[in-house]
Amino acid sequence: MNNNDMDQKAKELQNVLEQFYLTTDNPKRKEIDTILNNYKAQSDSYEHVQYYLVHSDNQYVIWFSLSVIEDKVNKAWNSISASSQTQTKGLLLDIYLNKTGANSNSTVKNVLPQFIISKLGQVIADIGRYEFESNPQSYLLNITSIVRNPSTSIRGINLLQCISDSFTTNKKVISQQKKTTLKKLLHQNSPIIIQVLVDCLGQLFDQNAEKKFKHANLLAFHVGSPDTNTYTASFNAESKNLTKAVFDALLSYFTWVPLSDLLVPSLFDILFKYLRLDKNSIPALECLNEIVSKNLVPKGFESFLMRIFHQVYSLLTDIVSNGGQQINQYHPEFLNKFTQFIQIFINNHLGRIETNPNFPIPDFLGLLFQYSFFQTQPESFLQCIDIWSTFLDYLINLSQENGTPPPSKYTDGLLLFQSELVKRILYIFNNNTLSELDDEDKEINENGISETQLESYIKKSIEVVAKVTELYPEKSLENLYPLFTQNVTSFFCKAEESIKQGVSMENEQQFQYLVKDVTTILHLFGRLADQFVVSFAQTFTAANFIFQKLLDMCLFSVNQYIYKFGSDWEKLQIELLCTIRSFCFWLAEYGNQVRAIVGQQPDFDSNITKLISIIVPLFERNAPESILSSAGKLLMSLATISKPLNLFTQMDMLISNIHNICAPLSPSIQSILYPAISCTILLPPSNVNLSQQWDQRRPKYSPFIKGITASFLEIPQIPNFVEGKIFCKEELIQRVLRVLKVVTAIIRTVPEVTQAKSILHDGIQDTLKVTLGLFRVYISYPIVLEAILDFFFVLFEFLKAQVGVVFTQQTISTFLDILGGDNLNQLLSSGNDTGISIIKKLIEILTFIVQQPGNSFESLLGSTIEFSMEKLYPMIANTSSVLRSPFFTLLYSILDNHWKQCQQIQINSILTSFQSIFKQNDVNLFKQNLDHFEKLNSKLKLYEKISSMEPVFGCSFISMFFDVLISDTQSVHTDDIIVTIYRFASLNFDKFFNEFFTTFLVQKNQLSNEQKQILRSNFSNAIDQPTFSTNMTQFINDFSYFSFINS
């Protein structure tokens, strides 16, 4: 074929490729992909693309040509002649070194884009895998000569990085044995490579940097200190690119080279020098971060740790000099990386340095203190706070493990840190920063809690303040006490005075930030309330003063309706209630103490009476729901945590009037307040020597619960309720939903006291049958069905013994009967979220029932399996439904608790469904079910049972797991799958090695007989788990590799 023909082919290829890449919505895209793959497979395509590389300047043609050569290199490099190999390599190297704009003197007009340059380097490195194995020294000598040549230096450095990536690849494009050999050889030669790169950095540094000044009078260290000069540099564009390329290459090696091989003084010296450069220190920091992040620390590392510490200390000294003005001279990205560096250093190595007298940790913390509070960006400040949190966790754990007080050498410094940290969350000290933080848009944090940026900032800071308090409780509380006595009390005095003078609080500017600060201080003391319990006797006077003031402030806020002054005042009132609630554990301890001291009970009772008299009026004054919710939760905590001795008596008036109070309230508030009253009646004092007062509590409870359920019990008696479609009326639907929500909340909070549960069950017994009857009536109303199922799930969970077996069986049978046919299809059709929620709740109920010990619910087993496997499973098996996870938990629970009661056909059906799902790509469900299998194997010897089920299963599960590993669809779970296979194999290693492998490999038509023989012979018959796992890893890699080269 002459050049004209080849040029025409190149143009045709260019046209096809541009259609493929430039028109992503092209309907012929799949067809074009097939054409391109067919062209790749042609025997002459390899020769053609080498012509295109020389004569075409179209980036798509060049990329395609390189991909063809890459295929040949990875799949059939040894099948072409040595001369052809040399020619191809020479062509690629020529393009790579001379036609990619490698240096500023290049005359190439059309410099190739970076993605093609990277591809070139990768293909050249892939070819190098064949050469390196036979003569690594010669190969590296050629590469280093490219590095040392000024005109090609950057390409040589890029190639060293490509070599690291290619020779240590996890891709299954080379055999496992070759991977191991390549990595071993590259590891042996890595000191040469790293030294070449270090020399490059040194040369660039000498050419472009000069000394600015040297630190004097830094701490005297006990080992040779590294260079702490500060340098300035003037790197041109070419030098910058070279420097970046070297650091990128170093990072590539640092990710896998053991730390012991990196402990080279010349490496650390040059990294430290670059660290002290004005503008080029970020890459050096990234390299140091990679080094200190390694957890496997070799002997001799401590001296290098000392050198690193000295650099951190020196750099911190620089940054915090001139009263923090110097920090503005550093690039924000550098400061971010440097903070990360300190964080990693503290996380991984604090235990090594904290007890070493050569490390002046207090002085270091002093610099870190300044560095933290000089930060100007909230995100940067919180990064520093995370470092302090790590350090405090270390001290707390050390103190707890050793049973000793925390080190006194940190006391003063940490108390000062605590004080300064508190200032950072108060507007009076930090107005500018706090005002910039978003306090409107909420985001879900790492704990699943929705909060604004401002709330997150304050909460994280308070948590660190609390850790200091945990370390030094008495001194910390003494340190923080004035915040409350001065700021909070004076604020309320000022607010009260302003109201008396008729000042309009909504527009009063002096209160704008004071309200927010007081809210924050209240939040802080609420968080610290547990420390008043820990040091109860020592801090009683201060805690009692705070509690009394909280009551006074709460009374003021209720009487003055302060929530009407604006949203900040509403938040303040909520925080007041939350802070008092935080003191419920302190109240519990207070109550326990006064019971042993004659004459002090009346004072305690007076506090409780006052608290109740303050809270109750809120429910009668149409306050915002957020405040009512907090008030209701406070009453619940009072009843369930504080458990005052005379609470039942003190709440008598509220109990008697509760229905009048609750009538105008929303169902959400009723479902908080009613359970609080329920617990007040049902929960006696915890002291066993005190009267439980059941003779008074039971008569009180009956009218209480009837007052809630009476309107609900009347519903079935309504004339023509069903026939006349009266049940469809919105008022009746809302009545059903309200009562079910309230009663469900009451059941959920029932005390773990048999007598209490009995009283509750007696009170709602007539409600149960009515509720079950309504399930059939409201079958077309998913929102009602969901409420009913939620009710029964909670009922079975908390009142299982009281409800009894007969009613439980009747209820479950009703559910399965009603939801087992067309209703199930309707609920799950078209992504009906409420319908899905209903079925999920049903699955959870069935799971709970199945998990109950004994044979009480054995009669439900058959219908549960039938519903699950014949009706529900076909609808969700091949979907991504959220029901799949709870569904398979139900199946696991059936096997776990009722294997012996299950028929063989049922077991087979369940195991087949597991096997089917294992073949799918759902990573989370795969892991869940694999864990289920491991638990079943531990308890029931599942794998032994499966292996004995021939010909139903035989080795099909092992084959399936092998196929999953080969497909790479569950690569994140590879180790767990191999463990499972080992457990199967260990039942009969002879059968596994002699029968399974033969059968498995015979079925794999994509491999040649020779390849199958290699796979089998490489898998030794060793039965210890480590060797087995290694063999499995090699088998899966090589199977995939053979499939790849055969494709």
UniProtKB/Swiss-Prot annotation:
Keywords on this record? Answer: Cytoplasm, Nucleus, Protein transport, Transport
Q: Name one GO biological process term.
A: protein export from nucleus
Chief location category: nucleus
GO MF: nuclear export signal receptor activity
Q: Which Pfam families does the annotation name?
A: Xpo1
Provide GO CC annotations from the record: cytoplasm; nucleus
Gene3D superfamilies, alphabetized = Leucine-rich Repeat Variant (1.25.10.10)
Compartments (UniProt record): Nucleus; Cytoplasm
Q: Which family does it belong to?
A: Belongs to the exportin family.
Q: Where is the Importin N-terminal domain?
A: 32-98
Q: Write out the function statement from the record.
A: Probably mediates the nuclear export of actin and profilin-actin complexes.
Q: Which residues form the signal peptide?
A: none
* Record-given protein name: Exportin-6
